[in-house]
Amino acid sequence: MSEKIDYYFSLISPWAYLGHATFMELAATNGLDVTFKPIFLQSVFDETGGLVLAKRHPARQNYRWFELQRWRDKRALPLTLKPRYFPCDPRLADKTVIALITAGHDPDAFIRAAFSAVWSEDRNIADPAVLAEMLAEMLDRAGYPSATILAAAAGPDAEAIYARNAEEAIAANVIGSPCYVRRGEVFWGQDRLDLLADAITSGRAPFSIL
């Protein structure tokens, strides 16, 4: 039976971007059953004591620059340290992932495109026109009307799932993006992917909260 992983993330998160390809490689190698769960980070932070970047102490903001550069080089990914459209409102983009899944599409190509849009291409994923362009490149050529996905992303069903994802994240002890949850054990941050891989390959029981 495939190992199940709940993957909590937001498309505005540089850490989710830096870890996404590595996580998907881990999933493919190990035959993981991944459930994509986009979340509105502000909702999770508000409930779990996290702070948006602008409200963090300068020392924490400064340390972030070191880590971004370290992991950019470690992952060998293009990364604009001060992207033109960061921060921006990620909600419509996040809900586009939900709309794709609901319509039966694999969201991975869109997720990768959206991450690249923010972190290497200086494009605004809060702009519906940018999202429409990305969707058209993926879906229209395959004969599926991309406008249908964007309309669904802006609709009440996607909003309800998005809100439920945040509620489930909080209940699961998720505190940021990305988080990978294996059988109740939370791995917070793309820098924990080696530990997740160890847990999966060893087949060990999940560690518990004492």
Question: Where are the regions that the model predicts?
Answer:
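C-terminal cap of thioredoxin/glutaredoxin-like
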Residues: E3-D6, I12-L32, T102-H105, A109, ...
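Structural alpha/beta surface segment adjacent to cysteine/selenocysteine redox centers
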Residues: L11, Y17-V118, F207
